[in-house]
Amino acid sequence: MDTKLTGKTRIESDLIGAREIPAEALYGVQTLRGIENFSISKFRLSEYPLFIKGLAITKMAAAMANFELGLLTVEQKDAIIAACGEILDGKHHDQFPVDMIQGGAGTTTNMNANEVIANRALELMGHERGEYQYCSPNDHVNCSQSTNDAYPTAIHIGMYFKHLQLLPHLEELIASFRKKGEEFSQIIKMGRTQLEDAVPMTLGQTFNGFASILQDEIAHLNEAAADFLVVNMGATAIGTGICAEPGYAEKCIAALREITGWDIRLSSDLVGATSDTSCLVGYASAMKRVCVKMNKICNDLRLLASGPRCGLGEFNLPAMQPGSSIMPGKVNPVSPEVMNQIAYKVMGNELCVTMAGEAAQMELNAMEPVMAQCCFESVDLLINGFDTLRTRCVDGIIANEDRCREEVHHSIGVVTALNPVIGYKNSTKIAKEALETGVSVYQLVLDHGILTKEELDTILSPENMIKPVKLDIKPRR
């Protein structure tokens, strides 16, 4: 909703004083102060729907627990839960305008949620916005809570949602590489180490390799994400549970499990957990691992597709757009390039998360807001990058089979396949002569009478060079 449609206002007060709030706004005075104090990054909470979902779930669970303890009336509990339910349905997200990067260890975000939920609950109860004597952002929505347990719990829940959102996009990219691996399984090409000719392989093995190294990362992401299911709800300010009644933490955890269906658990040491943001550090690191491999893959895609006439040219990437404002006909590998840049950004975010993670002091880490922003942003970047690379690059790759085969036939690297039969010393002599004369390894072996044509064809057949084999040929060393 547009909070400036009528120009009408209401008056709300806090510790600092009284302020006019747009009458249509569900948020209140503390959110307004947060807007004014932290116009920093343009990353608004409203742009992070799964974080907002985490906040709503956290507040809903707290209301359920507080009602069981007799701290809320039925009317207050029902209204708070209904307001949270509307937020979970995607409503009122425009009422979360605060900057993700903020001072105060997340208090602005927590109060934004408290105020929106309280004012919507008031409406559902038949009262006016701002009539907090009936349902207060602090006394009722935030009952038994501190920012220091509600905010990180909401981050954990939101990030676990993001993790579940990320995995299918990575799996689809892996499947695309696997499909190309199968399609190119019979295309022989040269492998390379240190950018130099090595030994033959298939183009399919290259793409299956891409798929396999990414597949390994799913387990690492799952392992890192599991830490999000351990929360400090009930810790309140510093982990001692001040202002929370006995049994509140356990009831809140039970409510969180009921709402989400996840195996959410209470930290075994709430004091330690309240200052510990290592789960964000761990997940950011897991995303960095993915990016290290994505950079390798995208660099390979760009190199192996280089050309079209004067590069390696083993395959063609789909032409997506003209590549130059001055060079006619030039087409660039824009999809791998943008994935490279996404990887750099995510790796930069990981460094930010690491530095903020080590900034914890005493019983709290006040730098958690930037850690949350970086992690949520990184997941979004990876999702967009994976989809772009898959649909606008990998799915449309076309192999240049003749070019790949020609490279193998003209490569000196095939001499390695002769090692078991003619020995390393003789193979070295052949390689040196081939390099000096330009004559193929195949022809030189025949010219010197080292092997018969039948023996040579057996050794250098594609199927015998791309996997371990036992050759029935007598060594000539």
Which role does the model predict for each range below?
Residues 1-477:
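Conserved, well-structured ligand/cofactor-binding cores
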